[in-house]
Design a protein with these regions (language model features):
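Short, conserved phosphate/pyrophosphate- and ester-handling motifs at nucleotide-, phospho-/glycolipid
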Residues: 134
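Conserved residues at the C-terminal ends of beta-strands
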Residues: 156
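A contiguous, well-ordered beta/alpha segment that forms the leading edge of an enzyme domain
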Residues: 1-130, 143-153
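Hydrophobic/aromatic-rich core segments of domains that either
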Residues: 151, 159-169
Length: 169
């Protein structure tokens, strides 16, 4: 769910939707065609500049927080029933086993012919960008606004907000 308001004489809805579709196509775990879904399903994926920018930012934040923020935590999240799989609470042995799947070191990065490819080092590890994707989507739509030299706008996606200027009200 998103809401965008801006002061401009043209309708930018199609451009906004196109930008949001790009973000969804990279980071949505609910989109069966997304890059992150392909990665999580065990495929080697070609990483776009957008994907690499968000991955690199996520790695930096993980490092800065000593691992408190980690986009590889999906197996643990799922074990507690917050993700796609709902099951009973994991016991300590399951938690210890799943913790081995968590960590940025489990992402294999290969550069070939000027392209970047990502794959898993461990079969059951997963990426989950849900902590950053909505904010990144808000920033991406804000970039559309700036590209059109729009000074006054508000972009809100799932509670993540990007603003500039003043309200028309």
């Amino acid at each position: 769910v998103y809401h965008v308001t801006y002061q401009y004489d043209k309708d930018l809805n199609n451009e906004i939707i196109a930008e949001l579709n790009k973000v969804d196509g990279e980071f949505s775990m609910f989109n069966k065609q997304s890059t992150v879904t392909a990665f999580n399903n065990g495929k080697k994926v070609e990483a776009s500049d957008m994907f690499m920018n968000v991955l690199t930012l996520s790695q930096d934040v993980s490092k800065d927080t000593y691992g408190a923020f980690d986009i590889t935590v999906a197996p643990l999240v799922n074990a507690w029933g917050f993700g796609f799989k709902h099951q009973k609470m994991p016991d300590q042995q399951q938690v210890d086993s799943l913790k081995k799947l968590v960590g940025m070191q489990n992402i294999k990065v290969e550069k070939m012919n000027g392209k970047t490819y990502l794959s898993k080092k461990l079969k059951n590890m997963m990426l989950d960008f849900s902590a950053v994707a909505k904010g990144f989507g808000s920033d991406a739509v804000a970039t559309v606004m700036r590209r059109h030299d729009i000074k006054n706008y508000m972009v809100e996606i799932g509670g993540e907000v990007a603003t500039s200027g003043v309200s028309a009200q």
